[in-house]
C-alpha cells in the first residue's frame, strides 16, 4: 500500500480576478499490482469550487533519485461522472553533492462524462534549483475552465518544501 496526497493553492494578485482562485487537495490510497509500478487507487478530492468527491482509478509511478513520474487515471463517483487524467513528472539531476536542478511538469485533464464536456484542465511548469527539501525557481501555470475552456495564465516565482 502507498498514499498519494498533493495540495495545490492558487490565488490571483488583482482584486476582482476570481477565476482560478482555488484550493485542490486530491488524496488516494494505492494497492500495488506486483512490482510493475501499477496500482489500484481509491480516494477523494477536496476542491474549493466543486466540493468533495470520491474516486477510483489506476496509478502508475516510478521514482528514482533523479526522476519522479506519476500518472493517474481516475473516475469520480458522483453525478458528474468525471474522468480525470493527472500527471506529475519531475527531473532532478545533481549539480553538486548538495544542489540539483529542479524541473517539473504537472497536468490534469478533467472530462465531465454526464455533461459530455471539458470541466477543467491545467499545465503547470517549474524550473529552478533544489537544495535538500527546498526548491525554488520560475513557474508558469496555464489553466482552462468549463466547456468553452476559459483560459487563465500565471507566471512568477515558486518555492516548495518536500516533507
Where are these predicted regions, by residue range?
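Detector for outer-membrane/organellar transmembrane beta-barrel domains
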Residues: 53-54, 59-109
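Membrane-embedded beta-strands of outer-membrane beta-barrel proteins
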Residues: 25-29, 54-58, 85-89, 125-127, ...
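Short secondary-structure subsegments characteristic of cysteine-rich extracellular domains
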Residues: 119-131
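Solvent-exposed loop/turn segments connecting transmembrane beta-strands
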Residues: 12-21, 44-54, 74-85, 111-119, ...
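Outer-membrane beta-barrel "beta-signal"
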Residues: 151-163
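Intrinsically disordered, low-complexity regulatory tails/linkers
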Residues: 123, 140, 154-156
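Transmembrane beta-strand segments that form the barrel wall of outer-membrane beta-barrel proteins
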Residues: 1-13, 34-48, 66-77, 101-113, ...
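Outer-membrane beta-barrel channels and translocator barrels
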Residues: 30-38, 61-67, 92-98, 130-134, ...
Amino acid at each position: 500500500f502507498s498514499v498519494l496526497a498533493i495540495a495545490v493553492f492558487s490565488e490571483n494578485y488583482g482584486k476582482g480576478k476570481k477565476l482560478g482562485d482555488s484550493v485542490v487537495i486530491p488524496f488516494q490510497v494505492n494497492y500495488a499490482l506486483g512490482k510493475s509500478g501499477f496500482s489500484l487507487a481509491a480516494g477523494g478530492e477536496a476542491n474549493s469550487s466543486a466540493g468533495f468527491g470520491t474516486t477510483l482509478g489506476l496509478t502508475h509511478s516510478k521514482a528514482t533519485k533523479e526522476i519522479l513520474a506519476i500518472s493517474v487515471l481516475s473516475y469520480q463517483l458522483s453525478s458528474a461522472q468525471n474522468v480525470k487524467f493527472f500527471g506529475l513528472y519531475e527531473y532532478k539531476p545533481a549539480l553538486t553533492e548538495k544542489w540539483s536542478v529542479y524541473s517539473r511538469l504537472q497536468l490534469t485533464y478533467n472530462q465531465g462524462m454526464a455533461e459530455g464536456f471539458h470541466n477543467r484542465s491545467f499545465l503547470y511548469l517549474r524550473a529552478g534549483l533544489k537544495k535538500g527539501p527546498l526548491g525554488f525557481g520560475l513557474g508558469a501555470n496555464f489553466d482552462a475552465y468549463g466547456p468553452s475552456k476559459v483560459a487563465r495564465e500565471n507566471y512568477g516565482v515558486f518555492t516548495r518544501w518536500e516533507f
